[in-house]
C-alpha cells in the first residue's frame, strides 16, 4: 500500500453508503488539573477547565466513517431525553441520516463521563440502560431494517450489549443483507458469538476471542486454535482478532492466516480503538479493497487513533501521511496548508508542542542548519514555512531566488530536524500561522520580539515567540558576494 493507492481508495470511499446499527452513547469528557487532595477523603480534587461531548459506542463508529469520507445512516434506539436529543443534534451536524433512530421513553440514553487530568483518565461514570428492547420497539427497528438495509454497500453491527442488538434485530439485519450479498461486519460482545452466525466478519480483541473460544491465547499456535473454534461455531468467512501492541491477525476460510504487525506509536488511550478498526475495515471494503488490504488500512488507522486521548477519529490526511512516512520518503514531509492543518491538529491532540519558523532559505548553508536545529529543540515538532518563488522575488528582487521553491523544499525536508515543510505565497506567514496555531514561533536573533510577524496572534492564544541566535558571518548574500568576487 503506497501513497497513490491510498489516495485512490479515499476517492472511492466518498461514494460508499454505509449503515451502522448498534448501541449509541454520549461520551462526556471533563478535562482538568489534579493538584490537590480532598480534605474530605484521600482522593484527588480535579479542577475542571474544559468540558466536551463526543459521539460514543456505535456513534464513534459513525463518526469514524464520516471522517473517512463515507455516507452514513445510523439505526438505533435512544431515550426520549436530553442526552438522546444531544446525540440527534450531533449526528445532524455531521450530516448523518437519523431517520432510523427511534425514541423510547422507557429507556435511558447511555452517557459515559470520563474525568481526565495530566493525560490520564482518573475515573469513569456510567449512566445507562442495559435491558433489551421491548417487543414493540424491536419490531419497529426490525421492520425498518427489513425495508431499507438492502440498499447499502456495507452494514456494521456495533454491539456494546446495551440492548439494541437483540437476536431479532441481528436476524433481521442478516436476512436483509443476504439477497444482495451485502457484507455485514460485527464488533462483537459477550461469549456467545453464535448469535452473529451468517455475518461476513467479526472483529473481537484478544480478550474477547479467549472468552468466546474458551482458549487462553499466549502465542501464535493458541491464537490460530482459538480463531478456528470461533470460525467453526459462527460459520464465518473471515475473522479479525486485534492483539493490542502485537497488531492484528486476519483469518479467512480461503487463505492462510495473515499477521499484521502494529506500527510503533506512543499509546495514550485505547478508548474506541475497536470502533476505529470496524469503521476502517468497512470503508475499505466498500471502496473495493481486498480483505487483507482493508485490514492493513484498519491497522494503520487504529495505530493513529490510540495515540490520541479519548474516543477520536482519524482523518484521511493522517493516514496518507502515515503511509508516506512508512515508505521513508523525505518528500512526504512537504504538505499543502490544508492537509498540514489537519496533521498539526492531530499532533496537538497527542500533546505535542509545535514550533513554527519561516524564511526563504535560498542557498542552504551551515548557518541555516544550525538555526533550524536550535529551533527544533524548542518543542516536539518543527514546521517550516517556506516563501514561494514569487514571494521571494517580491522580498529580495527579481534575481532571487537562485534555487526554485520545489528544490528548496526537498532539500529542507531532508533535514532530520524538520518535520514538515509548507510553501506559502503571501509576503508574510501570518495566514499560515493563523491556520496552524503553533505553540512557539521561532525567528532569528536579528529580530526583536515586536518585529516578529505573527507575535500578537500567537500570544493571543497562549503561545510565545522565541528568538534563536544565528551563526555570525553566514548568509546567502555573503555566499553570492564571494562567488561573484571569485568568478566574475
Curated annotation (Swiss-Prot):
HAMAP family: HldE
Catalytic activity from the UniProt record: D-glycero-beta-D-manno-heptose 7-phosphate + ATP = D-glycero-beta-D-manno-heptose 1,7-bisphosphate + ADP + H(+); D-glycero-beta-D-manno-heptose 1-phosphate + ATP + H(+) = ADP-D-glycero-beta-D-manno-heptose + diphosphate
Keyword Lyase listed: no
PANTHER family with a match to the protein in the record: BIFUNCTIONAL PROTEIN HLDE (PTHR46969:SF1)
Pfam family, one: CTP_transf_like
E.C. number(s) listed in UniProt: 2.7.1.167, 2.7.7.70
Identification of the protein by name: Bifunctional protein HldE
ATP-binding keyword on record: yes
Molecular-function annotations in GO: ATP binding; heptose 7-phosphate kinase activity; heptose-1-phosphate adenylyltransferase activity; phosphotransferase activity, alcohol group as acceptor
Keywords of the record: ATP-binding, Carbohydrate metabolism, Kinase, Multifunctional enzyme, Nucleotide-binding, Nucleotidyltransferase, Transferase
Binding site for ATP: 205-208
Membrane-crossing residue ranges in chain numbering: none
Signal sequence coordinates: none
Cysteines engaged in disulfide bonds, as pairs: none
BP GO annotations: ADP-L-glycero-beta-D-manno-heptose biosynthetic process
Active site (catalytic residues): 275
Function field: Catalyzes the ADP transfer from ATP to D-glycero-beta-D-manno-heptose 1-phosphate, yielding ADP-D-glycero-beta-D-manno-heptose.
Taxon lineage: Bacteria, Pseudomonadati, Thermodesulfobacteriota, Desulfuromonadia, Desulfuromonadales
Pathway this chain belongs to: Nucleotide-sugar biosynthesis; ADP-L-glycero-beta-D-manno-heptose biosynthesis; ADP-L-glycero-beta-D-manno-heptose from D-glycero-beta-D-manno-heptose 7-phosphate: step 1/4; Nucleotide-sugar biosynthesis; ADP-L-glycero-beta-D-manno-heptose biosynthesis; ADP-L-glycero-beta-D-manno-heptose from D-glycero-beta-D-manno-heptose 7-phosphate: step 3/4
Known partners and oligomeric status: Homodimer.
Stretch list, region Cytidylyltransferase: 356-488
Family: In the N-terminal section; belongs to the carbohydrate kinase PfkB family. In the C-terminal section; belongs to the cytidylyltransferase family.
Segments for region (Ribokinase): 1-330
Superkingdom as given in the UniProt entry: Bacteria
Natural source organism: Pelobacter propionicus (strain DSM 2379 / NBRC 103807 / OttBd1)
SUPFAM superfamilies: Nucleotidylyl transferase (SSF52374), Ribokinase-like (SSF53613)
Amino acid at each position: 500500500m503506497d501513497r497513490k493507492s491510498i489516495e485512490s481508495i479515499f476517492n472511492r470511499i466518498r461514494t460508499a453508503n454505509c449503515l451502522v446499527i448498534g448501541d449509541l452513547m454520549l461520551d462526556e469528557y471533563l478535562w482538568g488539573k489534579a493538584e490537590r487532595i480532598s480534605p474530605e477523603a484521600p482522593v484527588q480534587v480535579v479542577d475542571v477547565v474544559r468540558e466536551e461531548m463526543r459521539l460514543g459506542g456505535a456513534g464513534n463508529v459513525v463518526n469514524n466513517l464520516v471522517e473517512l469520507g463515507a455516507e452514513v445512516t445510523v439505526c438505533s434506539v435512544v431515550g426520549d431525553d436530553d442526552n438522546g436529543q444531544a446525540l440527534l443534534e450531533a449526528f445532524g451536524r455531521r450530516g448523518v441520516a437519523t431517520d432510523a433512530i427511534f425514541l423510547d421513553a422507557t429507556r435511558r440514553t447511555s452517557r459515559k463521563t470520563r474525568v481526565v487530568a495530566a493525560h490520564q483518565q482518573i475515573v469513569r461514570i456510567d449512566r445507562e440502560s442495559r435491558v433489551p428492547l421491548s417487543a414493540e420497539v424491536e419490531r419497529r427497528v426490525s421492520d425498518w431494517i427489513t425495508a431499507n438495509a438492502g440498499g447499502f454497500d456495507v452494514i456494521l453491527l456495533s454491539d456494546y450489549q446495551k440492548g439494541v442488538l437483540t437476536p431479532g434485530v441481528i436476524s433481521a439485519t442478516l436476512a436483509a443483507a443476504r439477497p444482495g450479498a451485502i457484507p455485514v461486519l460485527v464488533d462483537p460482545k459477550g461469549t456467545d458469538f453464535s448469535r452473529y452466525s451468517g455475518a461476513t466478519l467479526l472483529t473481537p480483541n484478544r480478550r474477547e476471542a479467549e472468552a468466546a473460544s474458551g482458549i487462553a491465547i499466549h502465542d501464535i499456535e493458541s491464537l490460530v486454535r482459538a480463531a478456528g473454534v470461533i470460525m467453526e461455531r459462527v460459520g464465518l468467512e473471515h475473522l479479525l482478532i486485534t492483539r493490542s501492541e502485537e497488531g492484528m491477525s486476519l483469518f479467512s476460510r480461503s487463505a492462510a492466516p495473515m499477521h499484521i504487525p502494529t506500527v510503533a506509536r506512543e499509546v495514550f488511550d485505547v478508548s474506541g480503538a475497536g470502533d476505529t478498526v470496524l469503521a476502517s475495515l468497512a470503508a475499505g471494503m466498500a471502496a473495493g479493497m481486498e480483505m487483507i488490504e482493508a485490514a492493513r488500512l484498519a491497522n494503520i488507522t487504529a495505530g493513529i487513533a490510540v495515540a490520541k486521548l479519548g474516543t477520536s477519529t482519524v482523518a484521511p490526511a493522517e493516514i496518507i501521511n502515515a503511509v508516506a512516512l512508512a515508505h521513508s520518503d523525505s518528500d512526504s514531509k512537504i504538505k499543502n496548508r490544508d492537509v498540514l492543518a489537519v496533521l498539526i491538529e492531530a499532533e496537538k491532540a497527542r500533546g505535542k508542542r509545535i514550533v513554527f519558523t519561516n524564511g526563504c532559505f535560498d542557498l542552504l548553508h551551515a548557518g541555516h542548519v544550525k538555526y533550524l536545529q536550535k529551533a527544533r529543540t524548542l518543542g516536539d515538532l518543527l514546521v517550516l514555512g517556506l516563501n514561494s518563488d514569487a514571494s521571494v522575488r517580491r522580498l529580495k528582487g527579481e534575481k532571487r531566488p537562485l534555487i526554485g521553491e520545489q528544490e528548496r523544499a526537498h532539500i529542507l525536508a531532508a533535514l532530520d530536524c524538520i518535520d514538515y515543510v509548507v510553501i506559502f505565497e503571501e509576503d508574510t506567514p501570518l495566514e499560515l500561522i493563523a491556520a496552524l496555531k503553533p505553540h512557539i514561533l521561532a525567528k532569528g536573533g536579528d529580530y526583536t520580539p515586536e518585529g516578529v510577524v505573527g507575535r500578537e496572534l500567537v500570544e493571543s492564544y497562549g503561545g510565545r515567540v522565541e528568538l534563536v541566535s544565528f551563526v555570525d558571518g553566514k548568509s546567502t548574500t555573503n555566499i553570492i558576494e564571494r562567488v561573484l568576487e571569485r568568478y566574475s
